[in-house]
């Protein structure tokens, strides 16, 4: 059985905030519209757990950006947008959580929570494109001597690479805002006509009109 690598921690954790944060926002919306305090208490607890899981997934994602190979400008800039989106969602979630620990939900916090969830969906879509179209993080497409998740030095490497990833995001943002280094074509994931970097092999089966992808 293949041992889990450190950069694989991010995709393993990211499903928790993607499920918990929208649930918390929906519970706050129900509490606000029905004036039911039970929903507000449930939402408060979910915000705490969801924000904590988002923080862990974010740190793991920052580290992963330094542990995989980003060979093309499109891969690097899509990773950049994915990281910026996740960081924005995390800051929004932490802000709403800090408010909700002491106060009841308001229309403003509900709007912020729902907006953060919308951004999380877009960022998650970019993450899917990075893996299934560009092939980021595939076996053999990582940095030399990748760190095992359960190795003794994994915590130190995680913190070190997360800091490097954060510094890389800041430096790339500066280059983008200065106008000297625009985003690569296709980095935003919404351009029409962009072709997948990793083509999917297909195999036609008798009696079927459409080819079926190979496993």
Task: Give the residues covered by each predicted segment.
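Short amphipathic, positively biased membrane-proximal segments
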Residues: 1-215
């Amino acid at each position: 059985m293949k041992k889990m690598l450190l950069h694989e921690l991010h995709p393993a954790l990211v499903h928790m905030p993607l499920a918990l944060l929208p649930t918390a926002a929906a519970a706050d919306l129900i509490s606000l519209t029905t004036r039911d305090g039970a929903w507000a208490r449930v939402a408060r607890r979910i915000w705490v757990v969801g924000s904590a899981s988002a923080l862990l997934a974010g740190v793991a994602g920052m580290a992963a950006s330094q542990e995989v190979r980003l060979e093309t400008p499109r891969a690097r800039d899509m990773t950049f947008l994915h990281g910026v989106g996740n960081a924005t969602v995390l800051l929004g979630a932490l802000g709403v959580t800090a408010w909700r620990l002491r106060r009841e939900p308001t229309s403003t916090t509900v709007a912020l929570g729902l907006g953060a969830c919308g951004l999380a969906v877009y960022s998650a879509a970019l993450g899917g494109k990075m893996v299934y179209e560009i092939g980021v993080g595939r076996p053999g497409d990582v940095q030399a001597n990748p760190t095992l998740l359960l190795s003794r030095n994994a915590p130190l490497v995680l913190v070190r690479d997360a800091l490097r990833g954060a510094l890389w995001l800041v430096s790339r943002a500066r280059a983008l805002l200065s106008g000297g280094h625009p985003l690569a074509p296709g980095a935003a994931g919404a351009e029409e006509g962009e072709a997948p970097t990793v083509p999917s092999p297909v195999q036609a089966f008798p009696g079927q009109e459409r080819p079926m992808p190979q496993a």
